[in-house]
């Protein structure tokens, strides 16, 4: 499963839910006819989205079988995922980009081979994506732009990203 969003809570009184998408585009989840919901990423419940619309960078969704606010409220906090087999394949060399979920948890080292930390998350700035790297032995994060000048190599097999970056830039 690949997590593509999280349910923020109910919307209105007719069973609609607010979904925070983790996709590049707000409507990215609308492409998938079947979703899987889970709190723990182990036990998945299959649901079918019936209707969608976008409101304030959130997806407002009606799921089949959920018709009132009470039932929708029970879904708050659940992760929204799809089977990896439903995602378009990407080239191994990164030409097509990367799925963010594949980058989270990867170790980050600088050009000298010094460990900086691990990827804790990513976000968009409009100009480019940014890695949020949890520094080794710390609870602090370093923000590193995900651009060619900085990201020198992404090796998904060895789970390592090499960056042209020094701490404190």
From Swiss-Prot:
A Pfam family matched in the record: PRC_RimM
Entry protein name: Ribosome maturation factor RimM
Stored SUPFAM superfamilies: PRC-barrel domain (SSF50346), Translation proteins (SSF50447)
Function: An accessory protein needed during the final step in the assembly of 30S ribosomal subunit, possibly for assembly of the head region. Essential for efficient processing of 16S rRNA. May be needed both before and after RbfA during the maturation of 16S rRNA. It has affinity for free ribosomal 30S subunits but not for 70S ribosomes.
Gene3D superfamilies in UniProt: PRC-barrel domain, RimM
Predominant localisation class: cytoplasm
Record organism: Nitrosomonas europaea (strain ATCC 19718 / CIP 103999 / KCTC 2705 / NBRC 14298)
Residue ranges annotated for the PRC barrel domain, each copy included: 95-169
Gene Ontology terms: biological process: ribosomal small subunit biogenesis; rRNA processing
GO MF: ribosome binding
Places the protein is found: Cytoplasm
Keywords from the named record: Chaperone, Cytoplasm, Ribosome biogenesis, rRNA processing
Record flagged with keyword Chaperone: yes
Family: Belongs to the RimM family.
Subunit architecture: Binds ribosomal protein uS19.
Annotated InterPro entries: PRC_barrel-like_sf, PRC_RimM, RimM, RimM_N, RimM_N_sf, Transl_B-barrel_sf
GO cellular component: cytoplasm; ribosome
Domain notes for this protein: The PRC barrel domain binds ribosomal protein uS19.
Encoding gene (name): rimM
């Amino acid at each position: 499963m690949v997590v593509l969003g999280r349910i923020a809570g109910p919307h209105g009184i007719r069973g609609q839910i607010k979904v925070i998408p983790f996709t590049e585009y707000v409507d990215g989840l609308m492409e998938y006819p079947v979703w899987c919901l889970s709190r723990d990423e182990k036990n998945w419940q299959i649901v079918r989205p019936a209707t969608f619309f976008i409101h304030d960078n959130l997806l407002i969704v009606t799921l089949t079988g959920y018709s009132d606010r009470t039932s929708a409220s029970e879904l708050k906090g659940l992760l929204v995922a799809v089977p990896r087999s439903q995602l378009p394949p990407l080239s191994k060399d990164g030409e097509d980009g990367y799925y963010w979920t594949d980058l989270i948890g990867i170790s980050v080292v600088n050009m000298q081979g010094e460990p900086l930390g691990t990827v804790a998350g990513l976000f968009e700035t409009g100009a480019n994506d940014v890695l949020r790297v949890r520094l080794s032995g710390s609870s602090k994060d370093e923000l590193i732009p995900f651009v060619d000048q900085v990201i020198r190599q992404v090796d998904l097999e060895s789970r390592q990203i090499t960056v042209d970056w020094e701490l404190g830039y």
